[in-house]
Structure formats: C-alpha cells, structure tokens
Amino acid sequence: EAARLLGSAPIDVLCFGGTSASFLHGTSYDVALTKKLTGWAPGPKITTASTATLAALAAVKAGTVALATPYVDGVHARAIRFLEENGHKVVSSRNLGIDTDQALAEVPLEKIYDMVREIDTPEASAVFISCTNFKSVGAIEALETAIGKPVVSAIQASFWHSLKIAGVKGAKPGYGSLFAGMEAHAPGGSS
C-alpha cells in the first residue's frame, strides 16, 4: 500500500530500505521485489537496499569482503549467502545477534567502528556493514582512513544508489570513497 501511495507522489526514486528483508530469500527475491514495487509504483525509479549494496560493491571494485552485521546468526548466514551468490566471497565476518529493531538503532558508533576493525583482514578488498537501521555512516571515513580500503554500509549504499539512478550530483564529502566524484562544484571549480 505504501508503495502505491508513494508511486503517485512527485518523486524520482523509491528505495525499499530493508536490507535483510530484501536479501533474506536470495537474489531472485530481491529482483522479484523490485518488479513488484515497479508494478505498484510505476512512476519513480526503484531500488532496494540489497540492489544498492551490490551496485556500491561493484563501484568500489570489491571482490572479497569482510562483513559486519547486527543480525542474529540465521540472518547473518543469509547475508553471507546473498553476497557470495553475487560474486563477493566473504573472508571474515562478525554479527552481534541483535533481534529487535530498536536495539539495532541503539548500537553506539564506537562499537561499529571497533567491530569493523576486528573483522578487517588483508584478504578483504572492502568491508560491508549490513542493515539500514545500523547507524554506521558516521564511522565510514575514519574507518577507510584507518584500514585503507573502501567501507560500504547499507544505508550509505542506498543513499548513493538513489542519487545515482536519479542522476543527482551534490553529495558532500564525509560519506566515504563510494561518493568520490559525486560532489557538486560551484561554477568556477570551487566547492
């Protein structure tokens, strides 16, 4: 119902923001979900958090990944399966075992930072932080500086992909290497 209502609104992009809800049943489910949303809301371009994640990992040329999630074991295992069925070997991972949405949103940024530092390995070409309710964006630039590789989060990827498919430039620095080249510049070349 929400997709139908939004489909008639003057919007350019509709992003289904549930990361685990879009990957839980695999890639074919994510594709079917996108088609269903397109049918319900034929006006805007459609993406999902999982589709956006795959596009973001491709953009940063991630092959092998280290995975950080707040999920319980079963959902974490499905996140690994989703990434691997889409060509991203998971070489290291950790999950927090959280099972409520409110608790997901209450994880301190420092804990997410420490978690990523723990799972990073030389074999990983990038780190992926799953869950759009896992507030990780504020740590991305510091993590990339510390570990020297791209860090992609589900919420960051969703925002980036929504801007990309809408053809929008204008991201401000601070969202990680995924946004390189998307900054808007004032006439004359200054920011």
Task: Show which residues each predicted segment covers.
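Non-catalytic structural scaffold of enzyme domains
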Residues: 1-190
